């Protein structure tokens, strides 16, 4: 069965039990519905995941208690990292203790964060999860398995939008959850049941395309990382600011909104488009659909083109944007 073949490949790469979905969004939603968390810490840049949690907290009503999204400050109140123990008298935990509930049910981290390419201390949150009994889930889409190994840092579940680096050709939608072997098989079975009842099964053709793509995954991403380094070294000498680097993806800012718009419109080889992880270089002006992101910021997903060709295209686009 093609679906099990591609899941087995992903299991071999990440080291857990893989469950594929029709999209990254459906994978994230499936985990939320499976855990049904009451108290959540959310660190996500991707707007779709933010919306999924927002809708869940608005619609879900457990024993007449609204689902609560905790802040980082509240998490730090709950857990004393120096003593490696919970602060029982924490105001953020006391209401949960009084109702005999966990201080935290789900910790969702997007690492690195999109589009600012910021990192979080996964191991600190793993300690917090161990103390509270929470599930630690990592959206590792932006780094890919070659850039980050969340299970080695204490994660329980890893999520990828396989549309991006795993597929790598911008020709399919897909998502996957990988469950660490420390969790019971019952948890994975619940995810499989959720997938079936929600109709979030990945199509046969898309599954075959993903299996095809996994055969070149390492070749593609290694080439993208090598090219990325060349482009960033060139960009460091240009009039740009706030350069945040991650292998194969980075963000930078120009001086004004008009310059950012002009840069994208002036590209000849690279595409001015959303998404990332494909074999073509994409430049995304995210502010056009997410106004919470700076209007001067551009996110670049490097493809497999020759570095000199990308630099030439960027150079003429920067001149047009002056």
Q: Model-flagged regions — what are they?
A:
Residues 17-241:
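Conserved PLP-enzyme active-site core in the AAT-like
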């Amino acid at each position: 069965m093609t679906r099990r073949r591609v899941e087995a490949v992903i299991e071999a790469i990440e080291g857990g039990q893989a469950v594929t979905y029709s999209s990254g969004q459906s994978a994230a939603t499936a985990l939320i519905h499976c855990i049904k968390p009451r108290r959540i810490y959310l660190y996500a840049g991707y707007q779709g995941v933010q919306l999924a949690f927002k809708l869940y907290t608005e619609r879900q009503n457990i024993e007449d208690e609204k689902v609560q999204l905790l802040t980082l400050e509240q998490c730090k109140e709950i857990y004393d990292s120096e003593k490696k123990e919970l602060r029982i008298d924490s105001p953020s935990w006391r209401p949960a203790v009084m109702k005999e509930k966990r201080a935290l049910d789900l910790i969702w981290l997007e690492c690195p964060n999109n589009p600012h390419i910021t990192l979080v201390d996964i191991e600190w949150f793993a300690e917090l999860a161990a103390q509270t009994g929470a599930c630690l889930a990592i959206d590792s889409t932006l780094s890919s398995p070659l850039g980050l190994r969340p299970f080695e840092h204490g994660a329980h579940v890893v999520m990828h939008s396989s549309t991006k680096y795993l597929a790598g050709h911008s020709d399919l939608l897909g998502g996957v959850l990988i469950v660490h072997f420390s969790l019971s098989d019952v948890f994975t079975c619940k995810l499989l049941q959720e997938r079936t009842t929600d109709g979030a099964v990945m199509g046969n053709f898309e599954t075959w395309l993903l299996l095809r793509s996994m055969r070149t995954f390492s070749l593609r991403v290694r080439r993208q990382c090598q090219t990325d380094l060349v482009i960033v070294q060139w960009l460091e000498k240009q009039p740009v600011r706030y350069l945040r680097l991650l292998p194969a993806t980075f963000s930078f800012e120009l001086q004004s909104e008009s310059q950012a718009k002009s840069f994208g419109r002036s590209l000849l080889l690279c595409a001015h488009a959303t998404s990332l992880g494909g074999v073509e270089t994409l430049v995304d002006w995210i502010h056009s659909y997410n106004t919470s992101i700076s209007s001067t910021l551009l996110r670049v997903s490097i493809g497999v083109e020759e570095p000199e060709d990308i630099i030439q295209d960027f150079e003429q686009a920067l001149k047009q944007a002056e």
